[in-house]
Every structure is written in structure tokens, then in C-alpha cells.
Amino acid sequence: MQVLHVCSEMFPLLKTGGLADVIGALPAAQIADGVDARVLLPAFPDIRRGVTDAQVVSRRDTFAGHITLLFGHYNGVGIYLIDAPHLYDRPGSPYHDTNLFAYTDNVLRFALLGWVGAEMASGLDPFWRPDVVHAHDWHAGLAPAYLAARGRPAKSVFTVHNLAYQGMFYAHHMNDIQLPWSFFNIHGLEFNGQISFLKAGLYYADHITAVSPTYAREITEPQFAYGMEGLLQQRHREGRLSGVLNGVDEKIWSPETDLLLASRYTRDTLEDKAKNKRQLQIAMGLKVDDKVPLFAVVSRLTSQKGLDLVLEALPGLLEQGGQLALLGAGDPVLQEGFLAAAAEYPGQVGVQIGYHEAFSHRIMGGADVILVPSRFEPCGLTQLYGLKYGTLPLVRRTGGLADTVSDCSLENLADGVASGFVFEDSNAWSLLRAIRRAFVLWSRPSLWRFVQRQAMAMDFSWQVAAKSYRELYYRLK
């Protein structure tokens, strides 16, 4: 079984979001599972520099100009690169300029990505062609459409990492991207009078996956579907929509081997976690005290992530004796709110604006509770890291959060399945009730330790996801 992942970023070569983490880990897990998985990426500067052994496979003149297809390896995974300097050789973000304006030629930059993905199934590399083209998010959404236009030389899977980003472009660009105008149709890639790369992926793929079972259900509902609910409900009825939970890359996220921690530990040596807490309290300017629960946030500061709820609930958390350590950036109003809280509650609230991968590991290793109060969350990786590190996740019941965290209810504690704290409603009162439950459990150290050990024993490895995808690919054949 030969599978080509078509996408725009891959950790650690280039990362702007969770998609990169998936592509950085899933293909390697699939190779270990017996699938010949390769990755197709635009040759953005950081990616091009990282694939040092790239060799020319093919040269083509396309609707988007001349391209060179390269092939090399990274971390044992075969990587195809679309070398088109006029489209991809730009500093900074792969999607927008330094003023945060989307590049005006994004329609060509990402149509080309989909086109090359489909051409691979028609022999662009004469020595390797995929049985399945697996496209990810709107950037690769045209790959299934180009395959459909070519009579489907390979099966296609389209994975939705976040339905909110739809890849919308003016209709006249149909003249530029070498797809039949008949595809510009409500039964096709047309959406609200424009081309939607996302809808192209959803409509033309043989199968759609979302990054968690709950998110796969949620995106059939109007409040989560951004206008796509009709199509997604139809795909659900046809059995062509399912959820496959993302995994954790255990080579990077494991407290037993994490060199970024002050003290490494396992579920059997959890007492060693205390040194990480002490170091984190010092680093964040918090009072050094192992008796108080340390809550943490590692997140983009947006209302989608529910960080306004944390700000609103913060006085209640602090009144009960807790501390907060926050690492993140985003909405200026939220940034200012958290910085003001740090000034108002010195020793209780520590805030670092920005994102530092290394420091996020130190927070995960040192905190007692990781807050993930998202309004919606397709999968979420932060809570999975929390489970792995015995840093109990406190989450809202939505998307992948609902699939991965079991509340510390009396029933779940008795059944031995409790792994964190879950609240239902997207308001500060509901969040505060969950925080109070965390304090109650904290007052029972042996029970807290029991739940930590439960959480750390859960298996969210990429091997589980790789097996699910392999079964899906074989069903499509």
C-alpha cells in the first residue's frame, strides 16, 4: 500500500499549527506499520533547507509556471518537494506577508500543491505512484478534485484538521487552475459564489476524516460546520465520514526521556515531578510552594480557545489558593488582561507572552493542571501532552477533548478511568465548578497520584492512529 500525504507544513521543518505535528509523526508511524507513506510539500525555504538530499525527479511546465519535483528524505520519511521559487521562496509565513495579508497568488500556490498530488497518481514520478492520496486541510483540498477530473487514478482521503479555514477564492480563478468549469457547482467546489478549496476536498474525496470521533459528529451540526453541514451530513449517511484521533509523538513528548525537563520521571517515579514544579515556579516568578496546585495555560490567546473564560474565572482560582502560569500570544485584549493579572497578583500569576517550544515542555513537566477550556477543539494536542506528563487536563467537553479526557467523577474514580476534569458549558461559572473539583481532588494526595498514574498509562501513540488509517485505506481499495 503506497500513500502520499499532501500538505503544507511538517514539524520540525516548518510549523504554524497542529497540522505540522501530525505530518511530522503520522507517516513515520505508518511506515513502521507496513505502509509505504511519503509526503508532498511545497519547497518553502525552511523545508527546502531541511531536506538536504533532495534530487530532481521531474520538471514540468504547469498552469502556475515551471516547477521541479524533488525527492529526498527527512527522519526516514520520503519527501517530495515542489520547487517553484516564484511561488514558494518567500521569507516568514508560508501563507501571508509581513503585514499579515494573505498572498494574492495563494490560489495558484495551493492549487499547484493539489495538482501535483493528483499528478503523482498519474506517474509524475515514474518509479513510485500512490494507491491513496491523503490530502490535509484546505491547502491540499484540490487534490481530490484533480483526481476526479482525471478519472480517479488513485483513491483519496481528505482530513479536516480545522473546518474554520476554507480556502476561499474568487470564481474567475477557475480560468487559472485547470479544472473544468463544470466543477464550479453546488455539487462541486462552489461555496457562496466562490471557489472553496476546503469544499473541493470534502466533495471529491472518497472518504473524509476528522481528527477526532466527536469532531466528526460535531461538523455535521450547523454551529460547527460553517455552512458545510448539508454536505457533511450526506457524507455521514453514506458512511464516508469518520474520526481518527491524533496521536502524541513519544520521541518528543515523554517525561521519561524529555531532556528539556529539570527532572525526568515516569508514572512510577512521580515524586521526581516536584523538582520541575519548583523550577517552573522560580522561572515564572511564582511563590515556591509544593502544597498549592499550579494551573497552566499553553495556548494561542483567542476566544476559540476559551481564554476569556480563564481570565474571568481567575480571581476564583486564586482565592482558593491556586497559582497560574501562562505561555501564549494572540488577542491583544487577552494579552493585556493576563499581564494586568500578573501585575495585580505577584507570586500567584506568571505570564510569558509569546511561544517557546522548549518552555512549553517545562510548563507541562512542572504544572499540576493544564487548562484547555476551548469553545471548539477538533482534536487538541495540549491535553494529550498533559495526560502523558501527569499534568491533569481540565477541559471543556467538545471535539477531541471529549474523546480523550474522563472527568474525575465518583463513578469514573471508582471504575479507574478518571484522567482529568471536564465541564460542559462555555462560561466562567461552569469552568470554576471544574476548578473547584480539581481543588477537592488536590486535597486528597493519594487519590490525585492515582489519577495521575491512570492518565499516564493511556495510549495515544501514533501507532494507534496509523492502524486506523491503514484499515481505512484497505476498505477504500
Swiss-Prot record:
Gene Ontology terms: biological process: glycogen biosynthetic process
InterPro entries, A to Z: Glyco_trans_1, GS/SS, Starch_synth_cat_dom
Source superkingdom: Bacteria
Catalytic activity: [(1->4)-alpha-D-glucosyl](n) + ADP-alpha-D-glucose = [(1->4)-alpha-D-glucosyl](n+1) + ADP + H(+)
Pfam families noted in UniProt: Glyco_transf_5, Glycos_transf_1
EC primary class: transferase
GO molecular function, one term: alpha-1,4-glucan glucosyltransferase (UDP-glucose donor) activity
One term under GO cellular component: cytosol
Biochemical pathway: Glycan biosynthesis; glycogen biosynthesis
Signal peptide residues on this chain, from the entry's feature table: none
Binding, ADP-alpha-D-glucose: K15
Entry's EC annotation: 2.4.1.21
Keywords assigned: Glycogen biosynthesis, Glycosyltransferase, Transferase
Family of the protein in this entry: Belongs to the glycosyltransferase 1 family. Bacterial/plant glycogen synthase subfamily.
Function: Synthesizes alpha-1,4-glucan chains using ADP-glucose.
Protein name as it appears in the record: Glycogen synthase
Organism: Shigella dysenteriae serotype 1 (strain Sd197)
